[in-house]
């Protein structure tokens, strides 16, 4: 068992002081948390500095904090920002460690069994271990996670109880240490020294923790006593310093002691016998044979190795849980008094709700056809109500909070004023009759001023027809549809910003990375057609695309004003009035955001800050493409090593697309 250090304090580092209505938002959120309020909403308009406000709140309340985002990219962006704000504290990153993941599945219509296939990202696996070990060691921890944090993880008690604690002067033989390391799933490898491994050289044992990537530890023995513990560079063996105490956490999150393992194996065998009887009674002899063969193999592996592929499917037995009981997750590694912040909650809470059902239907198929025992159903994500039971205090963060969040709390803290003084755009409704000619005139007016235009349509056909029409009228226009790959998409956005073309047409322009300060006009066609993209939240998000420019303007083309349109316009006008009053009172003149145009599709050496090298990928021959892939993979590794996961993911997408060219 390891004792958590609760004395560390969060220390926020920033050259900016809170401005606009950030001070009021921070004060209200902190007062409510300290007053014991369970749930509240931070409703912050686009570009108002919500992450900075979140950081200020974390520093003030000084609680371990879990920040959940709805995808890896956004989690990576938040992680980078929090690392900058809290350089002296433990800012951790916990997302799915699969670069590629094909879950185990069975398709009865074609009698196809799809074995689990995955590629584990070693860097992310390290960071996951770093997150869980930090949560057990200290209090000043921020974990930025995707919704994978509600998936089953091993028992935190078993994980904590399995920690091997070492100190100079401690009486323990070398062989006892080696056995202890094997028990927590470390591998002995005297040649290839990597994370989760140890090597032995006489009376010296070198251990490479699962949560590290550069530094390892050297334990020197004198007889049956530890003489000295040193931190070393894993590659060179260079000594970095002496260590008074070393805690070695297990190399896997699914770990159990020998007694619990025997009990678990007995339960697995008993369940197997029960399920075989069920299959035989139903005449499912093939399923029975399949299940017995697979389970017997897994039991043998658990007995001999303490581990098997797919061990998580037996986690209910290994954790000692009852049928239907929720699994342990990352949330169980936090102390009781912790804070949850849900970023883009209108998206993230929907994901949390939907995870359980999708997982359940796939696993039921595996159980029904003899690929897994029924207990595999309890290796699952949390249901939403189970997630709610883990909530001590929570802040939902969104420009457009969903109905669920609004039902949870009446406490809504607004953040409307932008530090740049920028206003929400003016919004007007125009009739659909003659909309093409009207829109053409508006576009030409923007082109003359060197500004750009977004047009959002509801159908692919309308987008294509509009693109053709505008091209005939001499407008430089492009259409961005869902089939466009990442590489092309980033190139299109860059070309729009540079003025290679002036108008971008799309169906859903709400995706992250579409904030373009040069866009002063957003045109919404078929604004009165109710649906996902034309509901109140969708419209507010689309309107926000024009909020980065001081000349921001939105035109909705519609024959009637729907309830969603009315609410979106009223909310935008309300925010705009507040922003204008603040600017007038403080003498602020709105300034368009000056955002550097990064050559996203060029081979950027961002890690070393060298100058950019622009490459036309389409002009490369086969050998040049191979060389480029190798070069990019090196840069991807460098980006990951300095924790710039956003860039690493971008480069990874380029590599994938280059391989497919």
UniProtKB/Swiss-Prot annotation:
One family from Pfam that matches here is UvrB
* Residue numbers covered by motif Beta-hairpin: 97-120
- Entry superkingdom: Bacteria
Which organism does this record belong to? Streptococcus suis (strain 98HAH33)
UniProt entry keywords in alphabetical sequence: ATP-binding, Cytoplasm, DNA damage, DNA excision, DNA repair, Excision nuclease, Helicase, Hydrolase, Nucleotide-binding, SOS response
| Keyword Lipid metabolism appears in the UniProt entry | no
Q: Where does ATP bind?
A: 44-51
A Gene Ontology molecular function term for this protein is: helicase activity
- What's said on domains? The beta-hairpin motif is involved in DNA binding.
Specify the protein name.
UvrABC system protein B
Keyword Translocase assigned: no
S-S pairs: none
Positions of the Helicase ATP-binding domain: 31-186
Q: Give the encoding gene's name.
A: uvrB
Any single GO CC term annotated in Swiss-Prot or TrEMBL for this entry = excinuclease repair complex
InterPro entries, alphabetically? Helicase/UvrB_N, Helicase_ATP-bd, Helicase_C-like, P-loop_NTPase, UVR_dom, UVR_dom_sf, UvrB, UvrB_inter
Q: What does the entry give for GO biological process? A: nucleotide-excision repair; SOS response
Q: Which residues form the Helicase C-terminal domain?
A: 435-601
Role this protein plays: The UvrABC repair system catalyzes the recognition and processing of DNA lesions. A damage recognition complex composed of 2 UvrA and 2 UvrB subunits scans DNA for abnormalities. Upon binding of the UvrA(2)B(2) complex to a putative damaged site, the DNA wraps around one UvrB monomer. DNA wrap is dependent on ATP binding by UvrB and probably causes local melting of the DNA helix, facilitating insertion of UvrB beta-hairpin between the DNA strands. Then UvrB probes one DNA strand for the presence of a lesion.
Q: NCBIfam families from the entry? A: PRK05298.1, uvrb
State the compartments where it is located.
Cytoplasm
Provide the coiled-coil residue spans. none
In this protein, which residues make up the domain named UVR?
626-661
